[in-house]
Amino acid sequence: MRTGKIKLKQNWRWVVAVLFVIMLLALMEIFHMRFNFTPSMPIGFYYQVAHPGILQRGQTVEVCLPKVIGEEGLQRGYLNKGSCEGGFEPVIKELIAIPGDEIQITQEGILVNQVLYYAPFIKLDMNGNAMNSYPVKKIKSTNQYWLYGANDPEYSWDSRFYGGVDRANIQGVIRPFLTTKITS
């Protein structure tokens, strides 16, 4: 008889754990919370701002990359499956350039209006895949927003590799809620 009570207690713990996870996921959806798993930005929980208004440099944004770019990220293992068109997850990045900004990619990083964002060009990613830099000498951004992995700029997959994104790709401005800074 005692074995039955032990199994019931163990099953009860699993039921409570599953209910807790379901409740946590429901609350995250209700309050527009996101969890970032990647080291590009601090790992942890973020919440989406209801009405971001005008996008500004320095804001953290959630972005569904253009389909072709996102599919490449999924294929290379940079992105997981998710809700964006093409079946990949949104990315969380810092916005470093907005329409009207002057952008130049150098060996050291991304130069925006003469401000350098450290992001050295790398030839191979951490999986040994060849990396292609976005071919930019110097451009003036028209309707493009440039993204930057501020937490781990050396290995982040950001606009230096695929260029800017349209406003329509930006899902919203998000802010950290409970995060920790971990780099690769």
Feature map (PLM): residue ranges:
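Residue "hotspots" at secondary-structure boundaries inside conserved domains
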Residues: 53, 95, 101, 137-138, ...
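Structural motif
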Residues: 45, 101-102, 109, 143-145, ...
